[in-house]
């Protein structure tokens, strides 16, 4: 199914140079197109341009961006995806006003996470992390930076880094 997004205030990520990789200072160059439209076909971008040059397109769903910005995907530059178990209860506790110290007294916090990570195999950490990666990809994340930090020992930090390498090797 085709989707036409029209009236885009700023279409971000336009690069017609054909570069496959951007590094160093070139990362500061972000191509943008003002007052734009974008046509997709399935999960592929088919065409784009300025509203002044929007051709007549039939048989597609139309979405009016109403002047909003459109990014090719979400870039999450700070994640700790490699950890064992779940920290959802800690998140709820924080929302409900508990302090970090109170959460730690209840068995949560970084020390609890470090203990669980230490006791979990690399294969299991990879499996859990890939579930998280697949979930964020399904929600529109196209680029993610994965940080270590839950290991607290050299051995466990290296374990996290090996899992991160596996994720990098097996993810889109």
Q: Model-derived features: where do they sit?
A:
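Short, acidic Gly/Pro/Ser/Thr-rich loop/turn segments
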Residues: 12-13, 82, 151
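Divalent metal-coordination and catalytic microenvironments
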Residues: 8, 38, 43, 67, ...
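N-terminal metal-binding scaffold of metallo-dependent hydrolase/deaminase domains
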Residues: 1-56
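Metal-associated gating/positioning segment near the N- to mid-region
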Residues: 60, 65-127
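Hydrophobic "anchor" residues on beta-strands that sit immediately upstream
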Residues: 2, 72-74, 143
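Active-site loop-helix segments enriched in His/Asp/Glu that coordinate
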Residues: 86-94, 116-172
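Short coil/turn connectors at secondary-structure junctions
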Residues: 1, 58-60, 66, 139-142, ...
């Amino acid at each position: 199914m085709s989707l036409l997004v029209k009236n885009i205030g700023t279409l971000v990520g336009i690069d017609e140079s054909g570069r496959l990789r951007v590094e160093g200072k070139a990362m500061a160059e972000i191509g943008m197109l003002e007052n734009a439209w974008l046509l997709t076909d399935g999960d592929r971008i088919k065409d784009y341009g300025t509203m002044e040059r929007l051709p007549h397109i039939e048989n597609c769903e139309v979405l009016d961006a109403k002047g909003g910005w459109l990014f090719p995907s979400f870039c999450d530059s700070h994640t700790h995806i490699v950890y064992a178990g779940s920290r959802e209860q800690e998140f709820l506790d924080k929302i409900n006003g508990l302090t970090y110290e109170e959460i730690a007294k209840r068995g949560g916090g970084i020390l609890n996470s470090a203990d669980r990570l230490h006791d979990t195999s690399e294969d299991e950490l990879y499996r859990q992390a890939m579930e998280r990666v697949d979930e964020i990809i399904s929600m529109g994340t196209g680029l993610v930076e994965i940080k270590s930090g839950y290991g607290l020992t050299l051995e466990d930090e290296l374990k996290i880094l090996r899992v991160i390498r596996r994720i990098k090797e097996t993810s889109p």
